[in-house]
Amino acid sequence: MLDPVEASSVPVVDDSTIRSLSDFPDRNVFRREDRYPALNIPVRRTAELRKTLKHVLWRRPKTKNVYDDETDPQRRILVLANIDEDAFRDETVQRLIQHEDCRKASYTVTTAYENYTVEEILKQLLPNESEIPSAFEMVGHLAHVNLRSSQLPFKYWIGKVMLDKNQPRIRTVVNKLGTIETEYRTFGMEVIAGYQGENWSVVTVKEERCTFRLDFTKVYWNSRLAGEHRRLVQQILKESQTKPLVVADLMAGVGPFAVPLTASHGRRNQVTVYANDLNPESYKYLLQNVQSNKCTNIHCYNQCGRAMVHQLQAENIEVDHVIMNLPASAPEFLDAFRGYEGVKRPCIHVHCFAPKASEATDYQDALDRCSSALGCTLDRISNDVHVHVVRDVSPNKNMLSVSFLLPVETQSLVKMKLQPLRTETSEPGAKRIKSN
């Protein structure tokens, strides 16, 4: 089992404190009327003046700032922002009032539940000391939040508001339970709003002109890694324009690297990918995504990443790039390259977590982990080492990408012996599928 990659434990809350949906306030509670400064303008000048006065116009989502003048069909009311300084002191507004056919006015605007943002509604619902959950991850039709202990009594209210404000884009809101500490990097979750019927957790995600189908409760997917997926895919595709390339994706998941590298997008494909994942569910969806995106030159496996490295060598498959996207423990898998028998020195791309200290310290910590697993020093110059921050994971942790050429010294090391792996699949040995 992998080490936990999150610091927090499962928040505990007394069930008796949890607010039910039946206790959610009536929407009329949020209804309010406010008087705003306004300009009474000719109908024919509406578009012109909205553009001229955009810096002082009143704005709110799903709410108009132009209304008909009920006393004169040839005129309209243009609502101005209720700012600290009188909106009528604005130079442009003064000029329009003094020299053109515009008049001072005021207008009562009704703001209802539908007009407020998620944050505005939750500020009215949650206690002052409770932090407002303002961010969430989208995975297909799912919204994924990670609520703190102080927010848990209001989890169903929070889910309802998020759902109300984001339909139909969001169909289900889930809250993460505990840490990511399973072998397959999945985590427990609970539905706090929306659809939870059959296949509620099976989603479709679009990325890099490809469509991915996956069960969010059974496989790992992080939408915040889209930029890193794009960066590495584009780097390899650009290199493949001048020569054919072979890529080994050792922890391929449902295919965020492997699928766009081999998908048919009207281009000549010069990339062959050997995609592997230990999770049988990831393997299942990888096969589906390979088929639905019409991928070519891809071989799919369901086995341990270390075994995959040894199998490629046993089959005399020369690899140009190796992708190891398992941040919690990918550097430790580099021990599989001891005694490497290939002629080429592949470029290896390892993703890992590192504590935040200083850039130099973080980078060196990642390099030390890689060197320790490889069994030799990873020299920055001779191994063409490149390190960069992929994303800010938490206040104390970054995710890094470490790319380097496999050191020649690994060839003289003793090849490690692999222990038989007990997986959740009942099928003996590795499963392999080829797509031409």
Curated annotation (Swiss-Prot):
S-adenosyl-L-methionine binds at H229, D277, L278, N325. GO terms for molecular function: tRNA (guanine(37)-N1)-methyltransferase activity. Its EC number is 2.1.1.228. Keywords: Cytoplasm, Methyltransferase, Mitochondrion, Nucleus, S-adenosyl-L-methionine, Transferase, tRNA processing. It is found in: Mitochondrion matrix; Nucleus; Cytoplasm. GO terms for cellular component: mitochondrial matrix; nucleus. The keyword Heme does not apply. One of its GO terms (biological process) is tRNA N1-guanine methylation. Specifically methylates the N1 position of guanosine-37 in various cytoplasmic and mitochondrial tRNAs. Methylation is not dependent on the nature of the nucleoside 5' of the target nucleoside. This is the first step in the biosynthesis of wybutosine (yW), a modified base adjacent to the anticodon of tRNAs and required for accurate decoding. This is tRNA (guanine(37)-N(1))-methyltransferase 1. It comes from Phaeodactylum tricornutum (strain CCAP 1055/1). The lineage of its organism: Eukaryota, Sar, Stramenopiles, Ochrophyta, Bacillariophyta.
